[in-house]
Amino acid sequence: MENLEQTCASLRAQIAATEAQLAGLKRDLEVAEQAAAEIKAQDVKSTGIREEGSEKKNPWPLLSEEYKRYGRQMIVPQLGLQGQLKLRSARVLIVGAGGLGCPAALYLAGAGVGTLGLVDGDTVEHSNLHRQVLHRSKNVGKFKVDSAIEYLRELNPHPTYVPYRAHLTPQEAPEIFKDYDIVLDCTDNPATRYLISDTAVLLGKPLVSASALRTEGQLIVLNNPPRPVGDKSGGPCYRCVFPKPPPATSVVSCADGGIIGPVVGTMGVLQAIEAIKVITSSPADETSASPPSLLIFSAYSTPPFRSIKIRSRRANCAVCSAEASVTVETLKTGSTDYVFFCGVAGPETLLRPEERITPLEFKKKHPGQVSHEQELGGSKEPTIIDVREQVQFDICSLDNSINIPISTILSSAASPTTSTPESLPSWLPHDIVSSSSTDPIYVVCRLGNDSQIAVRKMKELGLDQGGKRFICDIQGGLRAWREQIDPDWPEY
C-alpha cells in the first residue's frame, strides 16, 4: 500500500511538472508570435511595402528601429556597424540564470545578439531577488529561464531566446553547445565549471567564466582563441588554470558565505563585455591579443581591480593537450565523472545518534525557563552555544544563547592533557569551564554541520569532564528549528 501511494505521489508530481512545462511553452509561443508580428510590422514599415506586388527591398543592413536602438553603441569605434552585424548573427549560450547570468543576459540582449540560450533547472526564490535582476517577485516559483526570458523579451524582442529548463549534464552538453558560438559560465559549483570548460574546448567554443562570493569576484576568458585539441597556440582551459579541484569541504556557496548584489552584478556585466569583445573581434585581433589573465575584483579594496597573468595551455592537460583523455565520447557515455572528480561535501554526520538531539526533542526536554525552585531541586539548566559567525548571530538568535563562532573554536590549539579551567581556551565563558558546573551544553548552528564539528572539538578539549557533562548538537540547526518549533524564525 505504501509503495502504491509513493507511486501515485510520484506520478502526480510528474504530471504537475509536465503541465508547468507545457504552460511555459505556451507562454513562450505566445510571446514569440507577438514578437514576430511586431518585427514583421516594423519590416513592412521600414521597406515601404504598400500593397502586394509593390515590395521594395530595404537598402540598409539593419531595420530602421535597430539603428535607433543600437545607434549609441554603433558609433563607438571598437564596435561600429560591422560589429553590430556580428552581434546580430551571434549565438550566445549562458549556463546559469542567477546572479551572474542575469546581468550578462540583460546586457547581451540589450546589445542585440541574434540568439541567446539560457540553461538553468532552478526556480526563482525570494532569496534570489536582491541580486538576480531579471527575476521579479511575481515570478517566484517559476523556472529561472522562463522568468529571465520574459523580462528580456520586454527589453528587446529582436533576439531569439532559447530556454533549457534543466541543469547541464555531460550527456546533453555537447548537443546544446554545438548550436552556439560562445559560452558564458555563470554557475556556482566546480563540477559544472569543469564540465562547461571541457565541452567548450572539445567543440571549439570560447568561454567567458566568472565567479563571485561575499565582496569579491573573478573573471577569466578561456579557450580563446579556440584551437583544436593539441594546438598549443590556443587559449588555456579551466583545467589548465586549475588542474585540481578545490576540496569539496572548502567550497562555499552564496547561501553559506553570502554575496553583495552589486558585486556579482559587476562580474556578470564584465562577462557581457568580454563576450562582446570576442564576438566583434577580427582574426587580426587574435594574433595581437594579450596573454590570458585572471581579473580579480575586491569591492572593499583600493584599487578594487587587479590582474594576474596565467599560463598558456598545459602540455599534459586532460582536455586540450595532445595527451587528452577527456573526449566528447567520454562525456556522452558518462565515463568522465565530474562529481567523483570534484567530490561531494554532503551533509556532515560526525557524531553518534546519542550525541545529537532534534529541535523538537530539545523543546520537550527543556520546555521553558528553569525556575528557581527547579534549580534548588537539582535540575540542570541547559547552556546553548551558537557557533555561527557574529554577523549571523546578530541577525537572529535563540534566547539566552551564547555566541562562540566556529572559526574561534577551530583556531584553538591542540587538545589539552587536562580539563582544568586553567588549561581550557580563554574564549569559553568562566561559568561553563567551572569544574563544578555540569549543566548540559547544546550546540547549534545554521544547518547542523558546524555544530557537530564544535561538539567534537569541545569534547577533545575535555569540556565534557570525561563524560560527566552532556554535550550534543541540535540536529539540523536553526533551519530545523524553524521547521519544527518556530515557523516565524527568520530564514536567510
From Swiss-Prot:
Function: Plays a central role in 2-thiolation of mcm(5)S(2)U at tRNA wobble positions of cytosolic tRNA(Lys), tRNA(Glu) and tRNA(Gln). Also essential during biosynthesis of the molybdenum cofactor. Acts by mediating the C-terminal thiocarboxylation of sulfur carriers urm1 and mocs2a. Its N-terminus first activates urm1 and mocs2a as acyl-adenylates (-COAMP), then the persulfide sulfur on the catalytic cysteine is transferred to urm1 and mocs2a to form thiocarboxylation (-COSH) of their C-terminus.
HAMAP family: MOCS3_Uba4 (MF_03049)
Residue positions binding ATP: G99, D120, S127, N128, L129, H130, R131, K144, D188, N189
Keyword annotations: ATP-binding, Cytoplasm, Metal-binding, Molybdenum cofactor biosynthesis, Multifunctional enzyme, Nucleotide-binding, Nucleotidyltransferase, Transferase, tRNA processing, Ubl conjugation pathway, Zinc
Pfam families (alphabetical): Rhodanese, ThiF
Subcellular location field: Cytoplasm, Cytosol
Co-factor: note: Binds 1 zinc ion per subunit.
Positions bound to Zn(2+): C237, C240, C317, C320
CDD domains: ThiF_MoeB_HesA_family
Active site: C254, C445
Name of this chain's protein: Adenylyltransferase and sulfurtransferase uba4
Recorded GO CC terms: cytosol
Cofactor (UniProt): Zn(2+)
Signal sequence annotation: none
Similarity remark: In the N-terminal section; belongs to the HesA/MoeB/ThiF family. UBA4 subfamily.
GO biological process: cell budding; cellular response to oxidative stress; invasive growth in response to glucose limitation; Mo-molybdopterin cofactor biosynthetic process; protein urmylation; regulation of pseudohyphal growth; tRNA wobble position uridine thiolation
Domain of life: Eukaryota
InterPro entries hit by this protein: MOCS3/Uba4, Rhodanese-like_dom, Rhodanese-like_dom_sf, ThiF/MoeB/HesA, ThiF_NAD_FAD-bd, Ubiquitin-activating_enz
Keyword set includes Kinase: no
Reaction(s) catalysed (UniProt annotation): [molybdopterin-synthase sulfur-carrier protein]-C-terminal Gly-Gly + ATP + H(+) = [molybdopterin-synthase sulfur-carrier protein]-C-terminal Gly-Gly-AMP + diphosphate; [molybdopterin-synthase sulfur-carrier protein]-C-terminal Gly-Gly-AMP + S-sulfanyl-L-cysteinyl-[cysteine desulfurase] + AH2 = [molybdopterin-synthase sulfur-carrier protein]-C-terminal-Gly-aminoethanethioate + L-cysteinyl-[cysteine desulfurase] + A + AMP + 2 H(+)
Pathway assignment: tRNA modification; 5-methoxycarbonylmethyl-2-thiouridine-tRNA biosynthesis; Cofactor biosynthesis; molybdopterin biosynthesis
Entry GO MF terms: AMPylase activity; ATP binding; identical protein binding; metal ion binding; molybdopterin-synthase adenylyltransferase activity; molybdopterin-synthase sulfurtransferase activity; thiosulfate-cyanide sulfurtransferase activity; URM1 activating enzyme activity
Positions of the Rhodanese domain: 378-490
EC code: 2.7.7.80, 2.8.1.11
